[in-house]
């Protein structure tokens, strides 16, 4: 999985109004939605270095820390633009759990059209609780969206791929059938939050965020930042089934939300497409 938490930057589900989940902004950093990079994830961040503040940028804490290993490579990517079209310099840093900056790489943003920028970071240290830091070094403005830090070493070497050791363990089991993505996760707490497979294919950056089924199941056990980015979706599951040599068994919504949580039902006429050939 991606090591960055909330890589969509500002795209949050409506029950969680906090736009910087997983992030610590510093300096002049705001959430914007004018002329977005992705129509289904329309929010992005604008970072402004006005020349007076020492720093302007963001830190990402990952999932209780970003786990990195010495000598391993990690692919950083970001979609960025400069509203005034002037070349801007971003520094990408890996910071260890002692707040020491042990790796720094610079990339240049130029042009007022969205573009994907990438860099491979080779970690010089091992730490279970590292952080990713992005700084705007040049005076000016940069818009950023979908910031990602992904291990280069994945199953079959695929970008946005699976953890190699876990996928290998599945392969070694020699399964005949692979069922995905699960059971209750399909239902959702409501029809609005049910798992809709069409949202889990296509460009990863434009797969809409969805609430997780167990986000608010119990009032005394609420996890307001527990969401599905759908970075692992039907496309990746079918690829894995093919790699495993297993028969894929996809689970789809039958038009019922979790009947323990709600009594919502999709009208029968809306389900005709499930049974009729196209």
Can you annotate each of these PLM segments?
Residues 2-13, 272-278:
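Single conserved hydrophobic/aromatic residue that forms the stacking wall/gate
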Residues 7, 11, 45, 54-90, ...:
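Extra-cytoplasmic beta-strand recognition segments
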Residues 7, 11-45:
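Extracellular glycan-recognition surfaces and repeat-rich motifs
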Residues 31-43, 186-232, 261-271, 275:
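Aromatic- and acidic-residue-enriched carbohydrate-binding clefts of CAZyme catalytic domains
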Residues 97-127:
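Extracellular carbohydrate recognition and processing domains
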Residues 117-149:
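Extracellular beta-strand ligand-recognition surfaces/modules
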Residues 124, 154, 158-175, 229-244, ...:
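An active-site-proximal structural segment forming one wall of the substrate-binding cleft
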Residues 176-180, 248-252:
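Structural recognition of the beta-strand scaffold that forms the well-ordered cores
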